[in-house]
Regions:
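C-terminal lobe and pocket-closing loops
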Residues: 89-91, 259-268, 279-380, 410-418
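A structural signal for short loop-to-beta-strand junctions that line the ligand-binding cleft
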Residues: 69, 77, 102, 107-142, ...
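Extracytoplasmic/periplasmic solute-binding protein
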Residues: 125-129, 134, 158-206, 249
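Hinge/lid segment of periplasmic solute-binding proteins
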Residues: 83-134, 158, 164, 185-187, ...
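Short, solvent-exposed loop/beta-turn-alpha elements that line the ligand-binding surface or hinge
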Residues: 99-110, 193-216, 264-266, 277-286, ...
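Glycine-centered hinge/linker elements that transmit conformational signals in sensory
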Residues: 163, 203-233
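Extracytoplasmic "Venus flytrap"/periplasmic binding protein-like
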Residues: 41-112, 116-119, 141-152, 247-251, ...
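Short, well-ordered beta-strand elements
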Residues: 21-30, 50-55, 77-78, 125, ...
Length: 418
């Protein structure tokens, strides 16, 4: 019996040792699977015998699954988290579900602006991984075949849409089944149509959501739907990726993260990019950029030592180079070597030179409490507007009613507080 117990104990100890070398990572990004296979390979080559188990979840379900799992004492060692300020990551910090990293991870290769996106209460809560740039991506071959060039104004873009539609080509492929993409469209158009100065005034409470400029933007978007594909309310990003990759639509409102998928589906596609054009020639276009997210150490990690080794590696230019060559995303870490892809160079330049300093979607102060302009107003509201259930003015009223419940500058403007 003693011999059996000893053997069993050895097996338990061996299993514990083996499992302790595994780092489980949860994410909303399915496209990152190969990244972690390469990270594991590189770490092993460095003498660190760490196995990485990567799991990706549906993006719209991810945050709730992560929070509930961590609250229940289960879940990953490393979790993808959203940027700060933002209610979802703030909730993780306030519930002590993730650990600060400032004293254990070297942030010397991150700019202050990027580092600020993971900072709360004077601590860093994650290692940033990507900078995303949004705008209009187009099929260069379709444009060339039809004698089209990148528009400088919204009116020129409408002329392009008319030409394409007259030739039986869908000008835009929209993904209204996924409401978040409609908020993204609204926001990337807003930085060029409204302009950062107007958005700054909104953030200061000098204008509000019933301002005619805000309603005008929503009217432009509502009028644009005649240039979307038939049945666009039932299409999602998977449909869009296939349709755009194989030339079934000329343009998409999207982010640079889509490029990897389009090239995988159709290596021959030639993709161009332009910022959403302003509605008159005297104004400048702007790019909507944001720090996508970060890698965090969870408080329930069963293997924090190896998880930290993984996180330390993700803070290096070597990881940034690996990451961008697989995902075609712009790495958050400085010093990474970008792939020689003209589109990525152009998008990176747009993000560096034309980023709007004021925004109202991801990374904005309008999303840090409930009801959020992103999740609770524009996501369902844009769907309702596109379906004809509400008007642009009624959508503006919904924003006004929601944000005036907690957004202090707006509350002051409306006389709700002093």
């Amino acid at each position: 019996v003693k011999k059996f117990v000893l053997v069993a104990l050895c097996f338990v100890m061996l299993f514990s040792f083996l499992s302790a070398k595994t780092v489980e990572i949860w994410s909303w990004r399915t496209q990152d699977e190969q990244v972690w296979k390469n990270v594991e390979k590189n770490l092993k080559a460095m003498g660190k015998d760490i196995t990485i188990n990567f799991r990706a979840f549906i993006p719209t379900e991810y945050d709730a699954k992560l929070f509930l799992a961590l609250q229940g004492g289960t879940g990953p060692d490393v979790a993808y988290i959203r940027r700060l300020p933002g209610g979802r990551t703030q909730a993780l910090v306030e519930a002590n579900l993730i650990k600060p990293l400032g004293k254990t991870v070297d942030y010397k290769d991150f700019s202050l602006g990027v580092k600020n996106n993971v900072t709360m209460n004077g601590e860093q809560w994650g290692v940033p991984f990507a900078i995303q740039v949004c705008g209009i991506f187009y099929n260069m071959d379709i444009f060339k075949e039809n004698g089209l060039t990148e528009p400088k104004t919204w009116g020129e873009m409408l002329e392009i849409c008319k030409i394409l539609k007259s030739k039986g080509i869908d000008p835009f492929f929209m993904t209204a089944k996924e409401a978040w993409t409609l908020t993204m469209q609204h926001a990337m158009c807003g930085v060029s149509i409204l302009g950062p100065a107007w958005i700054k005034r909104l953030s200061e409470g000098k204008v509000d959501f019933l301002d005619q400029d805000w309603i005008y933007l929503q009217t432009l978007l509502n009028d644009l739907k005649v240039y979307y594909q038939d049945g666009f309310m039932g299409n999602d990003t998977n449909d869009m990726n296939s349709a755009f990759a194989f030339g079934q639509a000329a343009m998409v409102f999207y982010g640079v993260w889509g490029y990897q998928t389009w090239k995988e589906l159709n290596p021959d596609i030639n993709v161009g990019y332009f910022m959403v054009p302003p509605d008159w020639e005297g104004s400048s276009p702007y790019a909507y950029i944001y720090m996508d997210g970060a890698f965090a150490l969870t408080s329930i990690s069963k293997n924090p030592t190896d998880a930290l080794e993984v996180l330390k590696y993700t803070a290096t230019p070597e990881f940034g180079t690996l990451f961008t060559n697989i995902t075609a995303n712009i790495p958050a870490v400085d010093g990474a070597t970008m792939p020689d892809v003209p589109l990525l160079i152009e998008v990176t330049e747009a993000g560096a030179k034309n980023a709007s300093p004021y925004v109202y979607w991801v990374g904005s102060q309008f999303t840090v409490q409930k009801p959020s302009l992103y999740d609770d107003v524009l996501s369902p509201g844009m769907q309702a507007m596109y379906m004809g259930q509400i008007t642009p003015t009624e959508l503006a009223q919904k924003a006004q009613d929601a944000l005036s419940q907690w957004f202090v500058p707006l509350m002051k403007k409306l006389g709700k507080i002093k």
